[in-house]
Amino acid sequence: MFKLIRLEWKKNNVGKYIRNVVIMSALICLFIFALCYLGIANDPDTGVPDAAPGNSAISSSIELFTSMAFLVFTSVMLSTYIVSAYKNKTMNLMFSYPIKRQKILVSQMLAVWIFNFVALVLTKLLIYGCILLGSQFMVSSFPLDYNMASMGFYIQLLLKSVVIVTMSFIALFIGMAMKSSKATIISSFLLIFLTQANVGDFSLADNAILPVVLMVLSLIFAFLSIYNVETKDLN
């Protein structure tokens, strides 16, 4: 299986995705740093940070922007690796190999999932680390509500990253059903609106039950994406 995953990375030129992730992560890090220490979120009259409900601490902003960016980025990769292959018929050639269709499709999904999970975790660690380092020299506009010396911090970071990247399988299912890369990407934006919305002072992102529900739904949609691929007509 890992050989197939490596083949997918090589075939789709994973280097360009690494470059794009590095640029995206750097931009998010700079934005969060400016948000925290350069006062770009402060009210010009009062000097008080004007944050959205549920985002009064810096970790909420970090999770919000990294989740949005990587949910869309993962969906874009899935649309390139899988949905576009269905659309332009190159999947026909791949399915002519003496390998089960399900195994090929799973390897493509895992290639995207592993890449984005690792990238998301590293991006979060970079941002949290930079914000913590900045606190040694500057005063933050937002409370630093995390402790990088705590094991709980890393467990929570990993779990949230798993949920976000896995959610992209919902967008993949929609894109495959419609045979449309655009549908995959648009679905990822809709997922962002649904999961990161604020209702009054209540933030859906902070709901303890929501990640579990999303994880179960994502796995169901991932299963549905590969369930009947052995007999599915590609035309």
Residue ranges with predicted function:
Residues 16-41, 61-77, 118, 184-199, ...:
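Hydrophobic alpha-helical transmembrane segments of multi-pass membrane transport/permease proteins
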Residues 17-18, 100-101, 105-106, 180-185, ...:
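Membrane-helix interface segments
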Residues 70-87, 162-183, 221:
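Transmembrane alpha-helical segments in integral membrane proteins
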Residues 29-76, 107-172:
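Secretory targeting signals
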Residues 1-25:
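Aromatic- and glycine-rich beta-strand/loop motifs that create alpha-glucan
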Residues 226-235:
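Membrane-interface capping segments at transmembrane-helix boundaries
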Residues 200-208:
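Membrane-interface helix caps and helix-loop-helix hairpins in membrane proteins
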Residues 81-113:
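Helix-loop-helix units of permease transmembrane domains in multi-pass membrane transporters
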